[in-house]
């Protein structure tokens, strides 16, 4: 046990393994059949719409991240002389925002792939459809925790090895910028995606059902595509960033509590090891439960 606590590189390795697992699952989902040409066309339209929204949203968010990151860097620099703050607070914020955005992007990509493949597989058997659906969910879940573990552990080890004169409190204070960055992206992704989702949903209902008398989700209603794009934007990309923010925030909060109660490096690192143990066991269960051979 003492060896494990002293070798923090195990945490980095677990994050890398989680992302390798994500890649394997993503490739497996991609290799499943999309069905006939009409199904592929509709799926491509939904995917193009979802990715276009994500591109526009992330483009606007990049300006926000740069401005706030620069402001935090400046404020951290001003506080170096009088507190445990540091100009690298802005760097932690930037890394957290990037990881949060990646979590949403990974979820969006695999969701738009898994949707049509699950539908096609359901024509053959419920088991095949569930296998694809669960694999798509595993990509999202393991992507969130893998990025969170890599980001948090990587930053902590970087600060610990580079700034050896820092106290434990200063490392944790600078590390909180990572959670702030993740929360900022989650806020805009969740709210922005939710607004688009509801606008598309209400618009499709009003125009289709009320004005034209077309049933909801009917193929003749062109707004159905926008409605499905909205479902992916709000319930996948927004949810992914939101989960990432909650995951990271819970770990950092536990690390701060460990420092406040025990002022010990072991108490600070314990939440990371617990998170590592939980998600690696879940990944092992998922790997055993799905036949990767299709």
Model-derived features: positions:
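Helix-coil boundary and interhelical linker segments in multi-pass alpha-helical membrane proteins
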Residues: 78-85, 157-170, 256-270
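Helix-loop-helix junctions within the multi-pass membrane cores of secondary transporters/permeases
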Residues: 216-270, 274-278
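Loop-to-transmembrane-helix entry motif
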Residues: 49-61, 125, 129, 133-141, ...
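Hydrophobic, small-residue-rich alpha-helical packing segments that form membrane-like cores
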Residues: 169-181
């Amino acid at each position: 046990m003492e060896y494990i606590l002293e070798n923090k590189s195990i945490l980095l390795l677990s994050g890398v393994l989680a992302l390798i697992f994500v890649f394997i699952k993503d490739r497996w989902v991609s290799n499943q059949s999309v069905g006939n040409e009409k199904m592929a066309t509709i799926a491509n339209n939904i995917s193009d719409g979802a990715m276009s929204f994500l591109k526009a949203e992330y483009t606007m968010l990049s300006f926000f991240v740069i401005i706030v990151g620069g402001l935090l860097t400046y404020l951290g620099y001003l506080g170096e002389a009088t507190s445990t703050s540091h100009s690298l607070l802005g760097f932690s914020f930037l890394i957290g925002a990037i990881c949060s955005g990646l979590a949403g992007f990974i979820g969006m990509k695999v969701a738009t792939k898994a949707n049509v493949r699950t539908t096609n597989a359901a024509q053959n058997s419920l088991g095949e459809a569930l296998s694809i659906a669960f694999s798509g969910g595993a990509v999202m879940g393991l992507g969130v925790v893998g990025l969170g573990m890599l980001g948090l552990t990587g930053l902590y080890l970087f600060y610990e090895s580079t700034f050896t004169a820092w106290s434990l409190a200063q490392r944790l204070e600078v590390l909180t910028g990572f959670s702030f960055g993740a929360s900022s992206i989650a806020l805009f992704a969740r709210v922005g995606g939710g607004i688009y989702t509801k606008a598309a949903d209400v618009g499709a209902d009003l125009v289709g059902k009320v004005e034209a008398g077309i049933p909801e989700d009917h193929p003749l209603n062109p707004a159905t595509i926008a409605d499905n794009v909205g479902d992916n934007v709000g319930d996948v990309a927004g949810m992914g960033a939101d989960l990432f923010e909650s995951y990271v925030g819970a770990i950092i909060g536990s690390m701060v509590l460990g420092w406040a109660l025990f002022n010990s490096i072991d108490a600070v690192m314990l939440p990371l090891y617990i998170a590592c143990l939980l998600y690696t066991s879940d990944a092992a269960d998922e790997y055993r439960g799905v036949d990767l051979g299709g």
